[in-house]
C-alpha cells in the first residue's frame, strides 16, 4: 500500500506538476514531504501529515523550511 501511494505522488510530480508554475511555499516541497512522511510513518499517519502540510501551503502562509519530524508527538489528554 505504501508503494502505491508513493508511486501516485511520483506520477503527480512527473506528469501533472510540470503543467503548473512552481507554487510550493515550503522546503522540501509538499510532494517530497508527503513521500518522506509516508515512508517514515506509514500510509495513514504519513498521508495525514501530508494533508495538513498541503492545507498550510497557501499565499497567506510564510512557508519556509519545514522538514518531516523525526518523531510525531502525541497529544496529552488532561
UniProtKB/Swiss-Prot annotation:
Cysteines paired by S-S bonds: none
Keyword Membrane: yes
Alphabetized UniProt keyword annotations: Cell inner membrane, Cell membrane, Membrane
Membrane-protein topology: Peripheral membrane protein
Pfam family of the protein (one): YidD
One cellular component term from this protein's GO annotations in UniProt: plasma membrane
Highest taxon of source: Bacteria
Intracellular or extracellular location(s): Cell inner membrane
Family annotation (InterPro entries): Membr_insert_effic_factor_YidD
Family per similarity comment: Belongs to the UPF0161 family.
Functional description taken from the UniProt entry: Could be involved in insertion of integral membrane proteins into the membrane.
Name assigned to this protein: Putative membrane protein insertion efficiency factor
Source organism of this protein record: Nostoc punctiforme (strain ATCC 29133 / PCC 73102)
Amino acid at each position: 500500500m505504501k508503494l502505491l501511494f508513493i508511486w501516485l505522488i511520483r506520477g503527480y510530480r512527473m506528469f501533472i506538476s510540470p503543467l503548473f508554475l512552481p507554487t510550493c511555499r515550503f522546503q522540501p516541497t509538499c510532494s517530497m514531504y508527503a513521500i518522506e512522511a509516508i515512508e517514515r510513518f506509514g500510509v495513514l499517519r504519513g498521508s495525514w501529515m501530508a494533508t495538513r502540510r498541503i492545507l498550510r501551503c497557501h499565499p497567506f502562509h510564510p512557508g519556509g523550511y519545514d522538514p518531516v519530524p523525526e518523531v510525531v508527538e502525541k497529544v496529552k489528554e488532561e
